[in-house]
A protein has these predicted regions:
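Conserved beta-strand/loop positions that form the S-adenosyl-L-methionine
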Residues: 58
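S-adenosyl-L-methionine
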Residues: 94-144
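A short SAM/SAH-binding and catalytic strip from SAM-dependent methyltransferases
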Residues: 148-162
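Rossmann-like AdoMet
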Residues: 1-53, 70-100, 104
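Core SAM-dependent methyltransferase catalytic element
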Residues: 198-221
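A short glycine-rich, Lys/Arg-flanked "PGG" loop and its adjoining helix->strand segment in the class I
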Residues: 162-178
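Glycine-rich SAM-binding Motif I of class I
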Residues: 62-67
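Conserved beta-strand signature within the Rossmann-like core of class I S-adenosyl-L-methionine
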Residues: 149-151, 178-186
């Protein structure tokens, strides 16, 4: 896959995938988007509910969400089993070109550890996070864990429609605990209806600064 490194509005890097005409993050700010949708609306909400939980990320991409999650949990005393799925991982060279640690002035060794860790083997990333990276498509995986939180960060429905089908959300729903949360940037009506049809309680929240007006958070009830 041919990826072009770009700079988003908040100064943080992302990639543009030419063959799909798709960006890995919002052009309005990679870090701003990830912090708002996945950390604030997802991780912090679940952290207030449970001190020990399992997290699934669909679409690890640049590992920005993994890194920001680890930074947010530092010193919290929480324990999180984090599974990150990615079908087309970055090369180490691509990862090392990303400016997230330089931009925030911290987390350099942590970011490198995420990308240098082996695939398919659990690693104790920090005191709080045990990380398992899996190189696979969501469709091919058997989800055996009971996840309390899902970061759904696939490419847009019009670019990767197979990951937004009702069958995919059913698979996720069945793998989640009661009260489990799913957060995503997409608020399209058809996606909301699919989530509701399966049994999720769906709410629209304010979107990230300068980016999309709204985001979605769904809870298994």
């Amino acid at each position: 896959m041919k990826r072009k490194l770009i700079v988003t509005a908040d100064g943080s890097h992302s990639f543009y995938l030419e063959e799909m005409d798709e960006h890995y993050h919002s052009k309005h700010g990679s870090i701003a988007e990830s912090n708002h949708i996945f950390i604030e609306a997802g991780l912090k909400q679940k952290s207030a509910e449970k001190s020990n939980f399992k997290l699934l990320e669909v679409g690890m991409g640049t590992a920005l969400n993994v890194w920001l999650s680890a930074l947010a949990l530092k010193g919290s005393g929480l324990k999180v089993n984090y599974t990150a799925i990615e079908a087309f991982p970055l090369s180490l060279d691509e990862a090392q070109n990303l400016n997230y640690p330089d931009l925030l002035g911290k987390g350099h060794a942590l970011f490198n550890k995420i990308h240098q860790s082996e695939w398919e083997l659990p690693v104790q990333l920090t005191e709080e996070i045990s990380l398992l990276k899996q190189q696979a498509s969501l469709q091919s995986l058997s989800l055996e864990q009971a996840y309390d939180l899902v970061y759904f960060d696939a490419f847009a429905p019009e670019k990767q429609p197979e990951l937004w089908e009702e069958s995919i959300f059913r698979k996720l729903y069945d793998s989640m605990t009661k009260g489990g949360l799913l957060v995503t940037y997409c608020v399209k009506g058809v996606i909301r209806r699919r989530l509701k049809a399966i049994g999720f309680e769906v709410e629209k929240l304010a979107g990230p600064p300068g980016g999309k007006r709204e985001m979605l958070r769904a809870r298994k009830v």
